[in-house]
């Protein structure tokens, strides 16, 4: 069993579960006698050869810590050819045998491109949006849902106290998994997701029915990527675009709150959960899945695999070609959304 020098990085938005994955990688690598090197702040770490050692002592107590001890960024080395070449050079200078990238579609997509250039790469999926194809689960989703549920519970208390409608804006650029699951588990009175064009008149009638039967408040959950019909508002600040071309979203909750108040005459406030959904100690599931995904990634490295990520399929962890998720989004089935509308308050 040959010893290896394995690099690890975390890219894109942070989320709970990254540190457990790092711990899982290091713990499994120790079984092989490997040396693990952390690349700081995502692909920027490879570009700048900015590293840190990942020893047992460094990771033994990080299971319950949110975020990532390696730091993260949205650096895209493929924006410039010279950056690509610098990364390839640094990979060799650091004497890496393989690199494990923990991230979403963008981070894993970069890993896939480097794999095609001959650098051994394995991916671990993470995103609180749970919108990656080919996998049933992504790190961070479970904890983020818990945060959304807790927020809805707290906001319902204040909505009830002041006889208001509160609109909760939840992350989800193209997919509404977080808003739908968080809204259902939190008992939101109505939920809007990007996959289904919103019917505002249906929403207004729903709130009218609640008030007609004596209820004095409502909580509406909406994913940040929802496009309200008839509005041409900018769903993100002008010029606020990341290295992968994504506009930073935010604001649909405020627009919806204004429309509810204007059309129903009920005081309405908007709350944007934003980065609260990314922080905090990982849930039990995110801790266990992080450990298992990290372990499997190291095993794939020792099997000589590259260009793959560890997918969750039922109760199994299986290697999947990263190219199968590039440019794709795992969306909520509109039929499923319609079926669970029965749980919206009546």
UniProtKB/Swiss-Prot annotation:
It is found in: Cytoplasm. Catalyzes the phosphorylation of D-fructose 6-phosphate, the first committing step of glycolysis. Uses inorganic phosphate (PPi) as phosphoryl donor instead of ATP like common ATP-dependent phosphofructokinases (ATP-PFKs), which renders the reaction reversible, and can thus function both in glycolysis and gluconeogenesis. Consistently, PPi-PFK can replace the enzymes of both the forward (ATP-PFK) and reverse (fructose-bisphosphatase (FBPase)) reactions. Non-allosteric. Mg(2+) binds at residue 105. Keywords: Cytoplasm, Glycolysis, Kinase, Magnesium, Metal-binding, Transferase. Its EC number is 2.7.1.90. It comes from the Bacteria. This is Pyrophosphate--fructose 6-phosphate 1-phosphotransferase. The lineage of its organism: Bacteria, Pseudomonadati, Dictyoglomota, Dictyoglomia, Dictyoglomales. Optimum pH is 5.7-6.3 for the forward reaction and 7.0-7.5 for the reverse reaction. GO terms for molecular function: 6-phosphofructokinase activity; AMP binding; ATP binding; diphosphate-fructose-6-phosphate 1-phosphotransferase activity; fructose-6-phosphate binding; identical protein binding; metal ion binding; monosaccharide binding. The gene is pfp. Homodimer. Substrate binds at residues 127-129, 164, 171-173, 224, 269, 275-278. The keyword Transport does not apply. The record marks 106 as: Important for catalytic activity and substrate specificity.
């Amino acid at each position: 069993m040959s010893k290896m020098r394995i690099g690890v990085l975390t890219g894109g938005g942070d989320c709970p579960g990254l540190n457990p994955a790092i711990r899982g990688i290091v713990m499994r690598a120790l079984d092989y006698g490997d040396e693990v090197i952390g690349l700081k702040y995502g692909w920027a770490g490879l570009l700048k050869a900015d590293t840190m050692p990942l020893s047992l002592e460094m990771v033994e107590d990080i299971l319950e810590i949110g975020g990532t001890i390696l730091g993260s960024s949205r650096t895209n080395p493929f924006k410039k050819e010279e950056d690509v070449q610098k990364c390839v050079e640094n990979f060799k200078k650091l004497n890496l045998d393989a690199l494990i990238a923990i991230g979403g579609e963008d981070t894993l997509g970069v890993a896939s491109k480097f794999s095609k250039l001959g650098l051994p790469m394995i991916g671990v999926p993470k995103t609180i949006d749970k919108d990656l194809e080919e996998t049933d689960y992504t790190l961070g989703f479970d904890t983020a849902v818990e945060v959304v549920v807790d927020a809805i519970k707290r906001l319902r208390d204040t909505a009830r106290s002041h006889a208001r409608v509160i609109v909760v804006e939840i992350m989800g650029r193209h997919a509404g998994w977080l808003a739908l699951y968080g809204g259902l588990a939190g008992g939101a009175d109505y939920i809007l997701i990007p996959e289904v064009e919103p019917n505002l008149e249906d929403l207004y009638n729903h709130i009218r029915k609640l008030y007609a039967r004596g209820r004095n408040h409502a909580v509406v959950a909406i994913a940040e990527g929802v496009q309200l019909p008839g509005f041409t508002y900018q769903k993100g600040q002008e010029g606020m675009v990341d290295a992968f071309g994504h506009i930073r979203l935010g604001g649909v909750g405020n627009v919806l709150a204004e429309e509810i108040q204007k059309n129903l005459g009920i005081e309405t406030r908007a709350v944007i959960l934003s980065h609260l959904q990314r922080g905090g100690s990982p849930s039990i599931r995110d801790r266990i899945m992080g450990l298992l995904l990290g372990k499997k990634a190291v095993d794939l490295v020792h099997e000589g695999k590259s260009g793959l990520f560890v997918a969750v399929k039922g109760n199994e962890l299986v290697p999947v070609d990263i190219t199968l998720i590039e440019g794709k989004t795992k969306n909520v089935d509109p039929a499923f959304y319609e079926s669970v509308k029965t749980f919206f308050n009546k």
